Structures are given as C-alpha cells and as structure tokens.
A protein has these predicted regions:
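Short, flexible turn/loop "capping" segments at secondary-structure junctions
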Residues: 1-6, 60-63
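Active-site-flanking beta-strand signature of metal-NTP-handling nucleotidyl enzymes
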Residues: 5-15, 68-70
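Short acidic-aromatic low-complexity motifs
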Residues: 15-20, 35-39
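Short amphipathic alpha-helices within nucleic acid-binding modules
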Residues: 20-24, 75-85
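Structured segments of extracytoplasmic/periplasmic soluble domains
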Residues: 28-36, 85-86
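Outer-membrane beta-barrel domain signature
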Residues: 87-98
Length: 98
C-alpha cells in the first residue's frame, strides 16, 4: 500500500477482438515508461501495473474486455513530469481502440 503518494489510474473497455492491440499498447507504454521515468527522488515512479481481463456488469461478463493502468508516483512532481515527457516527445501511448 502506498500512503501519501500520487496515483494515476485509467480504465479502457474494448471488444475482445482488440485484445492484441491492448497488449501492444501496454507493452509500448511500459517500454516508454522504463526508458524515460526515474525510480528515485521527487519524480520517482514507484509502481506501474497493467491488468487485463473480462468486463463484468452486475456480476456477469459483458463480452467486452477491460484494460486497467495504474501508476504510482512519489508526489505530484512525478505526475507533472510524466505529462511533460509525453507532451514533449510524442509519447508512444495512443488510443488504438477507435
């Protein structure tokens, strides 16, 4: 558990036929994060986690898939740095689910 840290969390819902694209997005974003983000200091990325699985509604599978991204940073400076890096280099994170 991370106390007094800053977190970003995103959720995408998509059709199962886009599963390979979702996996590629996760791999590309993870590679970019590992190449550009520090693991120490005020801007530290403390955790990066992806989860992919079926979407549920009222306890039943909908037929769709869900992709969840969680990023935990030491503080707000890490989040600000994250978005600055993405904006300044045309980050490899994109929305291919359309």
């Amino acid at each position: 558990m991370f106390q007094d840290k800053k977190q970003l969390q995103y959720l995408w819902i998509f059709k199962p036929e886009l599963n390979d694209i979702a996996k590629r997005i996760a791999e590309d974003h993870t590679k970019w994060m590992n190449e550009t983000h520090t693991k120490e200091g005020d801007k530290a990325l403390l955790m990066l986690n992806w989860s992919i699985g079926p979407e549920f509604k009222d306890g039943n599978k909908t037929g769709n898939m869900s992709l969840i991204l969680t990023e935990v940073y030491e503080n707000q400076a890490g989040i600000d740095n994250h978005f600055d890096l993405a904006k300044n280099n045309g980050a490899t994170f994109r929305d291919d689910f359309n």
